[in-house]
Amino acid sequence: MAAAVVQLADLPFIRQFGFSPLVVGIVCGMLYGNFLRGTMPADWGAGVHFTARRLLRIAVAFYGLNISIQQIAAVGLPGLAVSVGVVASTLLIGTVAGQRLLGLDRDTAMLTAAGSAICGAAAVLAFEPTLRAAPHKSAVAVATVVLFGTLSMFLYPVIYHAGWLPFDTQALGIYIGGTVHEVAQVVGAASNIDPATTEVATIVKMTRVALLVPVLLVLGFWLRASAAAGADGKSHAKLPVPWFAIGFLVLAIVNSLDILPSDLVTAIRKLDVFVLTMAMTALGIETRFAQIRKAGPRVMALGLVLYAWLVFGGYGIVKLAT
């Protein structure tokens, strides 16, 4: 099924909207899981669960091969400052507003915030096993990435050409890369402006992706501390540190050292996208529409709040940093 999803995501009319195979995968998985689940052999259930949990962690670790220290250095201090500022503020706003203003549970609020703050569906996938969240919570979080990230692809070029973004090429690239949800959506938005902006935006976006590691480590230690104090009321006596985040960091360092043949790295990246697509499809199969309808409007409201922050708050952060 994941192989079919990858082919589907590569169709021109889907690719033009910046939908990654991960996004297409969860949609196809949800359609299958809700309308055709009766046709799935019972013994497939264990494989679906394994893919959505264990295989997911391995795939997130290998995503580190998309990052290098050289990329982070290329954007300089302004790009790094914007990335840190956007990620930290968006996670904080999403977690607090989601729980206190919109009445969402902790996991849904944090998954939605992660999708907006870091790298879209991939961040949701990385947070899900660390939080031990239910699959339907990941699905609704990804829905906000699809909606508002796609909107950015069309909105940003329009407001730039209207003269409402008074940035030079460097600052404009930092703004787009620092505030749009998915990597593909960043490329889609910036490519409608010019190649130089696209290059800067892509590098800044990958800097945000690199921040996934420290964020996951902080999250893991915070959850352990909360469990030890009994603060969240759950039984997490042996809550693990997200070791796949360590793997992500190690592989990013390996990629920075340029010790692997380029053809091998390219092949691993393609395989990793496929495995991430498998994991996202499996999450979709485990998700029920009734679960999404229950929290849907409030999650979308949180997605809108975070999107407004990215557009306007991100503008202010870029102005201060550049």
UniProtKB/Swiss-Prot annotation:
Membrane topology term: Multi-pass membrane protein
Keywords noted in UniProt: Cell membrane, Membrane, Transmembrane, Transmembrane helix
Cellular compartments annotated: Cell membrane
Pfam families noted in UniProt: Cons_hypoth698
InterPro entries registered for this protein in UniProt: UPF0324_pro, UPF0324_YeiH-like
Transmembrane segments: 13-35, 50-69, 76-98, 108-127, 139-161, 171-193, 209-231, 241-260, 273-292, 296-318
Gene Ontology CC annotations of this record: plasma membrane
NCBIfam families (UniProt xref): YeiH family putative sulfate export transporter (TIGR00698)
Family: Belongs to the UPF0324 family.
Protein known as: UPF0324 membrane protein BB4178
Species classification: Bacteria, Pseudomonadati, Pseudomonadota, Betaproteobacteria, Burkholderiales
